[in-house]
From Swiss-Prot:
UniProt record similarity statement: Belongs to the class I fructose-bisphosphate aldolase family.
Enzyme class name: lyase
Site-annotated residues for Necessary for preference for fructose 1,6-bisphosphate over fructose 1-phosphate: 363
Pathway named in the protein's UniProt entry: Carbohydrate degradation; glycolysis; D-glyceraldehyde 3-phosphate and glycerone phosphate from D-glucose: step 4/4
The protein's name: Fructose-bisphosphate aldolase
Record has Lyase as a keyword: yes
Keyword Nucleotide-binding: no
GO term, biological process aspect, one: glycolytic process
One of the record's GO molecular function terms: fructose-bisphosphate aldolase activity
Amino acid sequence: MSRFQPYLTEAQENDLRRIAQAICAPGKGILAADESTATMGKRLQQIGVENNEENRRLYRQLLFSADHKLAENISGVILFEETLHQKSDDGKTLPTLLAERNIIPGIKVDKGVVPLAGTDNETTTQGLDDLASRCAEYWRLGCRFAKWRCVLKISSHTPSYLAMLENANVLARYASICQQNGLVPIVEPEVLPDGDHDLLTAQRVTEQVLAFVYKALADHHVYLEGTLLKPNMVTAGQACKKAYTPQENALATVRALQRTVPPAVPGITFLSGGQSELDATKNLNEINKIPGPKPWALTFSFGRALQASVLATWKGKKENVHAAQEELLKLAKANGAAAVGKFEGNMGTTLGDKSLFVANHAY
């Protein structure tokens, strides 16, 4: 009997690797449209639109029915479960709109954060119990990748050893289950930007968290070539009194990744973490311009930083749909350029430099 029992066939590994590589193709990234019903409610409230299923459907239809040019810079979209079953005005399922544009549908599979007992307001993420059966069903409905978010906070005594260990193991269990069911797992250990910590502290904590994550992924025999990482960019805390340049943020980010992320991982798809549309894009651009070894694609998996101007333009009005879609195309093109280090510094969107920070952000 072999000491190591493979849990994936060669064909399964090939499929996972192919999907992961397609998602992080040069100049392409992910639109994170997986906001929960409650979070969508907050976004719709900001533009004076009622949070009901029809308005959520109309908004997501707006996103997914944009011009086919969207696929030049968006390779995948993360969906919320409700969206899987919603249909466009002409009767097509919303994931079908994506497939018609050669955009890969993905799905958020975690069930939110819950308190981690024995810690100071730290959390773990729930949703493992029925994950295998849900993943099998999501694959049947056309999804080819998944996302699971864990959250860690920086303070004088957090993240704790327990929180880092627990969240890393949860992410590894999730990743293993996804792969067994044909879904590429996006591993998201978000270190929140809340706090007054400086850039070096953010870098060191990010390194610590990622080290825990990749140890757990190895322990659980996760096939790294069939995964993607969705980390925070390394930035100082929102309340830090010192301002750092995009170049300083980029250098700290790349150093943290070089020290912790194996080269077998095909791509790193950064979250925007409440940065303004312009700041997130500038930071991504500078990350790609940093010299030195970067063996992974460095691209985006943005939610707010790809949608804020879209929502502000739409305002829930049918006559604004085309203009809102044009905002989405501008944002996608700008971030596609940033993903190869060629963003020119201006995207011309409605809310380009407006901060999108939400304290203690929950999806």
